[in-house]
């Protein structure tokens, strides 16, 4: 429901000036193992609110979202998430912490929501570490091993075709079950001097 309530496109358009893409799962669309058949949740706050009401969600509670200090895009993303969730009646309090403290709070379950980011690795198995039960990097504290096992099966295969089938199933399970909400994949921007020779330029 929260995934439907958050307007990710606004984050890409306003905070990144279009230099990014809305995330469906842990892999961006240009990743060689991205599943082209993924069906993302569409932004639909009315449907999100209905889902929460049907599930008996507690709208009276104020939920704590913790955010790392110093990353402007991430801090602004937190404000947009807060606004989007308040539109469907979910009260969110934002607190910022240094990165070490934030990670420890997540590991100890001292927050309802946490905002983190990471790079996109060419290894499709890289994202599964945050889904491994009892791992220190499992910040959402998920106990079900199904997602980690799906990714691990892909890592055990030899050919790209075999691995692709496993990682497609892995991504589809993540989109269906939503143990995490992936917000966006931000483009890497590089600046260089025009005095450098043999550098391909878009202009």
What would you call each of these model-derived segments?
Residues 2, 65, 85, 106, ...:
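Hydrophobic, well-ordered secondary-structure elements that form the walls
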Residues 151-155, 160-175:
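Short amphipathic alpha-helical coiled-coil/interface segments
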Residues 10-15, 100-133, 174:
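Pocket-flanking alpha-helical
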Residues 28, 32-49, 57-60, 105-109, ...:
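Short, solvent-exposed loop/beta-turn-alpha elements that line the ligand-binding surface or hinge
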Residues 53-120, 160:
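Ligand/substrate-recognition segments at binding pockets and active sites
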């Amino acid at each position: 429901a929260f995934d439907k309530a958050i307007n990710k496109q606004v984050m890409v358009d306003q905070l990144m000036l279009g230099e990014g893409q809305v995330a469906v799962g842990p892999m961006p669309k240009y990743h060689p193992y991205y599943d082209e058949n993924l069906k993302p949740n569409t932004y639909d706050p009315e449907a999100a609110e209905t889902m929460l009401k049907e599930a008996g969600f507690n709208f009276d509670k104020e939920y704590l979202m913790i955010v790392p200090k110093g990353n402007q895009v991430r801090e602004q993303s937190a404000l947009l998430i807060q606004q989007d969730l308040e539109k469907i009646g979910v009260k969110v309090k934002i607190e910022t912490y240094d990165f070490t403290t934030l990670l420890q709070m997540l590991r100890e379950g001292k927050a309802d929501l946490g905002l983190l980011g990471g790079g996109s690795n060419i290894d499709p198995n890289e994202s599964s570490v945050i889904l491994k039960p009892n791992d220190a990097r499992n910040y959402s504290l998920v106990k079900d091993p199904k997602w980690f096992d799906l990714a691990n099966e892909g890592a055990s295969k030899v050919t790209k075709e075999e691995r692709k089938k496993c990682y497609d199933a892995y991504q589809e399970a993540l989109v269906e079950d939503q143990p995490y909400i992936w917000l966006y994949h931000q483009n890497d921007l590089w600046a260089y001097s025009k005095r450098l020779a043999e550098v391909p330029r878009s202009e």
